[in-house]
Amino acid sequence: MTNLNEQYEEKVRPCIDLIDSLRSLGVEKDLALPAIAVIGDQSSGKSSVLEALSGVALPRGSGIVTRCPLELKMKRKNDGEGWQGKISYQDHEEEIQDPADVEKKIEEAQIQIAGVGVGISENMISLEIASPDVPDLTLIDLPGITRVAVHGQPVNIGEQIKKLIHKFITKQETICLVVHACNVDLATTEALQMAQEEDPEGERTLGILTKPDLVDKGTEQMVIDILQNEVIHLKKGYMIVRCRGQQEIMQKVSLAEAIEREKAFFADHAHFCSLYDDGQATVPRLAEKLTLELVHHIEKSLPRLEEQIEEKLEQAQAELVRYGTGPPSDAAERLYFLIDKVTAFTQDTISLAAGEELRCGEKLNIFSALRREFDKWSIHLSHTGQKFNARIDKEVAIYEDKYRGRELPGFINYKTFEVMVKEQIKQLEEPAVKKLRDIADAVRKLFLQLAQCSFTGFPNLVKTAKAKIETIKLERESTAESMLRTQFKMEMIVYSQDRTYSNSLSDRKKEESEEEERRKGPKLHKERNCMDNHATLQELMLHLKSYYNIASQRLADQVPMVIRYQMLQESAVQLQRQMMQMMQDKENMEFLLKEDLNIGCKRATLQSRIKRLMKARAYLMEF
């Protein structure tokens, strides 16, 4: 470790301190930070590895001993300096004077967070250790993976633990440190399987083999094959360590002495000595590798971390703008605050009706929806006209028999023409009214959405605006329906300017003639039309189609104009007028400005988030 500290003194500690500082700010609530998460099946030797790295005893025993994520922050001090410890969780922070007290303090913290028993919690405990005997390193210890619930444990304890582990190791910023006992088949290790699920390429997974002294004679080569990456490939590779066994703990073998025993074990081992020579064995070498891996991972993650902080900060600031600053306490200022709120809303309703950008920031556009609806109306008129033309061919002879009077053949019966035109146009009235109701409902929803956005956090203002929007919608819809029905009553007067009608009739005759020529030729057409009364009927059909074309064009414009004028322009103006009149009642001000209790909490949360993100940005800029 001396060589490591000399080589990376200016690099290692600042990198790790930076991430620790960001984590202590609570930035991990907002984005993922580079970390090393330690996972392993129960009895894999995970606690022993952490004890060897930290130099302090951690909770151990049968069953689940790690019941909360434990952030283990180790800081190397100069030789001769004293040991320091600190534990913090929730709102509690406590200095630890004696390394022997660490285990007890962690157990107390777990009881406070996860309760008495064997339940687990996602809330983290932070343990900080400063000593000349520890590496510059931060690890997150996670509960050991269990398969079967024992007495007192929830039936789904295994699923709870896996869910907690996945929450940490799914982040690309997390290095997975998988602890595995040498005397257990690697393929059955659940911790490694979970790491492979989240990191299938093995790019951010490091394997740690423990308990090499328990390997059966003759199977040493299998362990070496794993360490040489020939069994399950991990890009970060494998390390092997020998920590204190249960017997050594009972014999009170110190951690320092255990390190010396470990060194002798590997150096003198017939099969594992090569691993020691290659730097793949012992806790000190593991500490060195982990430190370098973490520093490299931090440096690699910093550019993306800066981007994430800027993104999250921008999002939080934009969200805070939506919630606003809250109403002031001074009565006069409260009135001005209300006026500003209502004015901004009413101006946005006018802007919405005009298709302009809104001050509230919402991307609401009614005209794209209106355009689609009015296009549908135009298509409906066209389709109805096509059906009318097809029906004319079948029914015109019937109408001729029914309504023809004393006229000689060749004279068009105007009454027949009028009856058929009126009947066809009358069929368009209800579809026009339905189109009005559909659009009225769409406009109402957008106005309600605008009110919700403009008066976020003020439920009484929202309710008042909604009530007015509903009332105005009914009034304007009734007026618009009356105008549409009047329009259709006027359409019962068969009328068009002579020039307009003559042009339409001429165009229709030209189209019919061209169509007939394409089908049978002009000579045959003329001969057939002169044979009998068919010529009269053909003439009547031309008149019917010509007039419907004029009337449908008139309705294609008039119906949308009525709807748009009443449901948009007039509704917006009336809403603006009524909202302004509402503010004349000064006694109503306090009722309208009563804020939603949750909004104050959300605003405080956002302000806190912005504060810590700005601090985090400052830390990164200074780094």
From Swiss-Prot:
Q: Which parts of this chain are annotated as the region G1 motif? A: 40-47
Q: Does the keyword Membrane apply?
A: no
Q: Which GO terms fall under biological process for this protein?
A: defense response to virus; receptor internalization; synaptic vesicle budding from presynaptic endocytic zone membrane
Q: Which SMART domains match?
A: DYNc, GED
Region (Disordered) residue spans: 504-527
What Gene3D superfamilies does the record tag this protein with?
Dynamin, middle domain (1.20.120.1240), P-loop containing nucleotide triphosphate hydrolases (3.40.50.300)
Provide the family line: Belongs to the TRAFAC class dynamin-like GTPase superfamily. Dynamin/Fzo/YdjA family.
Mind telling me what this protein is named?
Interferon-induced GTP-binding protein Mx
Q: Gene behind this chain? A: mx
